[in-house]
């Protein structure tokens, strides 16, 4: 395409005179320059704010905007060489002929540049995947299916005359001469899910067959907009990377039937206790305000954060989940508390810990960066050398880099996670309430006799079990605490749930003991000492990293994993894992390729996996990535894509996951049974546990 002509300022002045009064002039155009080279897409100066996306490699890049002649008036850059931070619009000089911004890129990928020629200013963010080139997964060889009937040998599995049903398509057929022939539904991806028409009596629930739906409460569904801005929490008016989005217990309760339709028997919710009220700077360069929407930065472990709801809405959630046969797993943090934010120091009356507070607005949480500062700039108002930090958590409770506090160590237990105040869980010293809670008027925390830090934390967490009937814990940052502390938490949780069931016999689902699954970072399918210290299961990091993609591309390649998991997990009643394809700390499976057919295929291989499984909200609906502000894990915490699943391919995707999930829910043998391969082409296997028996057939991939 031919570009519009460009004119120097002299020619523009001449053309503006009488000789050219009847002409319509082309809008002036400039380009984004990266490392001295122009990006092909032109930016038109008279159309207001414009954006473009450009792929950058990891490393440092020189960034400016201008024309080929570097002309004053159309040459935009900083007045002097300086870094270009992510997420914050940086002022520019329109006559910056020899200066550029330096942009440090940590992850190669697409980056979005937003240029306002009127200010003028430039902002950069890591682009969402929607604007990136759609990648293709690496090729994976697979058996082929022509779309026609498939015959599978069932000799030794069911006798002749047995009537079977394909749970996916609802077709039925009879075993004849040890074989059965059916045509898989095209929507199934070549699957037959064979079960006897006369089904065995369903076995009672066991945690061995856990199918867990994991969600970030704040990002799932907003049922009560009135609680969206508790403690004066604000939107940032930009990309809302890490602000509170409004999800709450009421919204989750409204979606319980949806979760049940996916075949889930448990729901893992992120920590619900009162979080720090304010924000910190997000990312290395302070690109955005980072609130504790996720739940991992606690302030008061005895209170529900009002952004999530209140005790009434929590009780309703638990009771309604139980009515549907679903358990509630609560995420708990024993390792650390939240950061000190401006809002907390003001709300808790800890003003002695600040400096230059006269420059703050009346409501400190309304501070915004200006004058070239980024969101880390709030730190200038906190006096980290004040002798009054003993009024905060106090040196008997946490280690932190503060005056009078124990200093962080270098091992897993005594080191800090992301600089968060680290609880002294290894200490056996009796302590009183931490000073900030002793002075907090609305806390439920009470001093306990002869209690250590870990004793308090255990008491606070298990109180939710005793009062509301929480069925289990997902333990955060497990390896950063002593194993014995986790064992004590499990014992206390078991006692608390037993008490609740005794007091609420009409609400108790069963007499199963308390359940605990742990996050030991990078743990795989291995039984170790953690299982002797309170844990029924551990999160399996291996499956997403090693197996999810290739087995989604060709389910026939799943058999070694299926056989290994069934043998190692299902022959040991005291061993299990929780496998996943997406999580809040790693990545979204859908985010890598944005491929709906691939997302259907991963349902086939993943939902038939032995052992426990964890479905991350939106796996079933192709939820996309959010803007991350340069912090990769923020992208995987986007809002649930309810608006996309009412119709079209995303609605059909959800139906596919529902069929797989309901089949898994109906048959304990899938998660907890023995596994035996029957044939290679078509790939087929039998799972069996007690009276429950199913056969799964994968005909192959269609060309």
Where in this protein do the model-derived segments appear?
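Gram-negative bacterial Sec-dependent N-terminal signal peptides
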Residues: 2-24
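Insoluble glucan recognition modules
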Residues: 19, 23-173, 186-197, 211-217
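Short, solvent-exposed loop/turn elements at domain surfaces
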Residues: 39-42, 72-74, 220-229, 526, ...
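Acidic glycine-/aspartate-rich tracts in secreted/extracellular proteins
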Residues: 68-73, 219-221, 667, 702
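Active-site-proximal helices and loops of the catalytic beta/alpha 8
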Residues: 132-179, 183-190, 195-197, 318, ...
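Conserved, mostly hydrophobic/aromatic
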Residues: 164, 215, 259, 269, ...
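Substrate-binding/active-site clefts of carbohydrate-active enzymes
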Residues: 204-210, 220-463, 467-468, 489, ...
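Loop/turn elements at helix/coil->beta-strand transitions in domains of secreted/extracellular proteins
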Residues: 208-212, 260-267, 322-329, 468-473, ...
């Amino acid at each position: 395409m031919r570009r519009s002509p460009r004119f120097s300022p002299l020619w523009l002045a001449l053309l503006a005179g009488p000789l050219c009064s009847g002409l319509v002039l082309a809008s002036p155009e400039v380009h984004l320059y990266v490392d001295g080279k122009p990006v092909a897409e032109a930016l038109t100066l008279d159309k207001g704010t414009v954006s473009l996306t450009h792929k950058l490699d990891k490393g440092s890049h020189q960034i400016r905007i201008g024309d080929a002649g570097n002309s004053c008036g159309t040459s935009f850059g900083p007045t002097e060489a300086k870094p270009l931070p992510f997420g914050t619009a940086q002022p520019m000089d329109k006559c910056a002929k020899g200066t550029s911004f330096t942009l440090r890129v940590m992850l190669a990928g697409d980056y979005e540049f937003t240029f306002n020629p009127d200010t003028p200013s430039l902002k950069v963010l890591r682009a969402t995947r929607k604007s990136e080139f759609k990648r293709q997964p690496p090729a994976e060889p697979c058996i082929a299916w022509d779309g026609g009937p498939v015959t599978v040998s069932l000799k030794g599995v069911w006798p002749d005359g047995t009537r079977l049903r394909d749970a996916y398509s609802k077709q039925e057929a009879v075993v004849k001469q040890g074989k059965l022939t059916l045509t898989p539904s095209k929507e199934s991806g070549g699957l037959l899910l064979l079960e006897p028409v006369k089904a065995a009596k369903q076995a009672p629930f066991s945690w061995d067959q856990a199918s867990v739906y994991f969600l970030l409460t704040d990002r799932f569904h907003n049922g009560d907009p009135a609680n969206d801005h508790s403690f004066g929490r604000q939107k940032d008016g930009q990309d809302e990377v890490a602000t509170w989005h409004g999800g709450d217990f009421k919204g989750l309760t409204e979606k319980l039937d949806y979760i049940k339709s996916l075949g889930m028997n448990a729901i893992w919710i992120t920590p619900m206790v009162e979080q720090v009220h304010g924000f910190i700077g997000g990312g290395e360069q302070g690109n955005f305000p980072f609130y504790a929407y996720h739940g991992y930065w606690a302030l008061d472990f005895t209170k529900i954060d009002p952004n999530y709801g209140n005790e009434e809405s929590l009780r309703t959630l638990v009771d309604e989940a139980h009515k549907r046969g679903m358990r509630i797993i609560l995420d708990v943090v024993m390792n650390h508390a939240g950061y000190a934010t401006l809002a907390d120091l003001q709300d808790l009356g800890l003003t002695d810990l600040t400096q230059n507070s006269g420059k703050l607005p009346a409501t400190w949480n309304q501070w915004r960066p200006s004058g070239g500062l980024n969101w880390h700039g709030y730190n200038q108002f906190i006096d980290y050398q004040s002798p009054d930090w003993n009024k905060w958590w106090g040196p008997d409770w946490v280690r932190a880099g503060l005056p009078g506090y124990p200093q962080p160590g270098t091992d897993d237990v005594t080191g800090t996670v992301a600089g968060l105040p680290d609880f002294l869980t290894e200490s056996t010293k009796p302590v009183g309430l931490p000073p900030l809670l002793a002075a907090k008027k609305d806390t439920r925390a009470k001093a306990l006799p002869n209690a250590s830090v870990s004793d308090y934390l255990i008491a606070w967490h298990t109180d939710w079990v005793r009062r509301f009937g929480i069925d289990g814990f997902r333990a955060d940052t497990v390896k950063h605490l002593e194993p014995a502390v986790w064992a004590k938490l499990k014992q206390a949780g078991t006692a608390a749930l037993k008490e609740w069931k005794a007091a609420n016999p009409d609400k108790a689902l069963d007499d199963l003991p308390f359940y605990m699954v742990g996050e030991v970072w990078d743990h795989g399918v291995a039984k170790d000492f953690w299982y002797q210290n309170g844990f029924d299961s551990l999160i399996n990091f291996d499956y997403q990293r090693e197996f999810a993609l290739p087995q989604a591309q060709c389910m026939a390649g799943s058999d070694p994993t299926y056989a290994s998991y069934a043998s190692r997990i299902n022959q040991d009643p005291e061993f299990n894992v929780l496998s996943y394809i997406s999580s809040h700390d790693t990545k979204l499976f859908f985010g890598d390729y944005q491929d709906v057919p691939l997302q259907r295929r991963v349902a086939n291989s993943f939902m038939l996996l032995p052992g426990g499984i964890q479905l991350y909200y939106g796996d079933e609906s192709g939820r996309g990535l959010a803007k991350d502000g340069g912090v990769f894990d923020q992208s995987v915490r986007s809002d649930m894509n309810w608006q996309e699943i009412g119709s079209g391919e995303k609605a059909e995707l959800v139906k596919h996951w529902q069929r797989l999930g309901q089949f898994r829910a109906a048959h304990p043998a899938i998660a907890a049974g023995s596994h035996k391969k029957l044939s290679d082409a078509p790939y087929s296997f039998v799972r069996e546990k007690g009276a429950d028996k199913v056969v799964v057939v994968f005909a192959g991939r269609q060309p």
